[in-house]
A protein has these predicted regions:
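Conserved anion/nucleotide-ligand pocket segment
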Residues: 1-60
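Short acidic (Asp/Glu) and glycine-rich catalytic loops that position anionic groups and cofactors
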Residues: 38-44, 79-81, 115-120
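Glycine-rich, charged/polar anion/phosphate-binding loops
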Residues: 49-50, 66-71, 100-103, 159
Length: 192
């Protein structure tokens, strides 16, 4: 990540993931490996062709808190952005996610996006529970707002999940929906 070269294609995690929480204040647990669940692939819910834009987003709950403040991105920032969203370890419900997405539509940003990337839900939820988030994304984005061409990828390895990839805010990225590839096409750092 600290290279001036573009990051390149990001591949789904194949090593597994965990919801196990250890008390890191206990020195004995600091070296203990957590139990991993089998890897689950990213889910490409909709979209065709290739889209490019800047990475913009973060924790859904925090973004919702920022709406209406000076820290909320300017309207122009949403144009063609690849919005990445993830939920916190508090595991907000799919209904909450739907309400926030509807609010994003009401403030005029949802229909400006190039794509939606959704991280594996945070908290200690079972993998079967993750599908409800896919359904609410489809319901709001596709059925309610008619954005059936907006690429949506879910179950990605970022956010309040372990292990997690880091998405550099504001850099250019590309989705190839036909090849199911996610590429960060710009370096997150500049040479001095």
């Amino acid at each position: 990540m600290f290279s001036s070269e573009p990051i390149g294609t990001i591949h789904p995690n194949t090593d597994g993931w965990t919801t196990e929480v250890l008390d890191w204040s206990n020195p004995e647990l600091q070296q203990q490996r957590r139990t991993l669940r089998p890897s689950s692939s990213w889910r490409w819910l909709q979209g065709q062709g290739t889209v490019s834009g800047s990475l913009l987003g973060g924790c859904l709950e925090v973004l919702d808190w920022l709406r209406g403040t000076p820290y909320w991105p300017e309207q122009a920032a949403w144009k063609d952005a690849l919005l990445f969203l993830e939920t916190s370890e508090e595991a907000p419900s799919p209904d909450y996610v739907g309400r926030v997405l509807r609010t994003f539509a009401a403030v005029g940003m949802l229909d400006q996006l190039g794509a939606v990337l959704f991280g594996r839900p945070g908290g200690t939820q079972e993998p079967e529970q993750h599908l409800a988030y896919d359904e609410i994304l489809r319901q709001v984005i596709t059925e309610e707002y008619g954005l059936g061409n907006l690429p949506i990828i879910t179950n990605m390895d970022f956010g309040h999940t372990d292990p997690m990839m880091v998405l550099p805010y504001g850099v250019q990225a590309q989705l190839d929906c036909d090849r199911k590839e996610f590429t960060i096409t710009e370096s997150p750092v500049a040479e001095r």
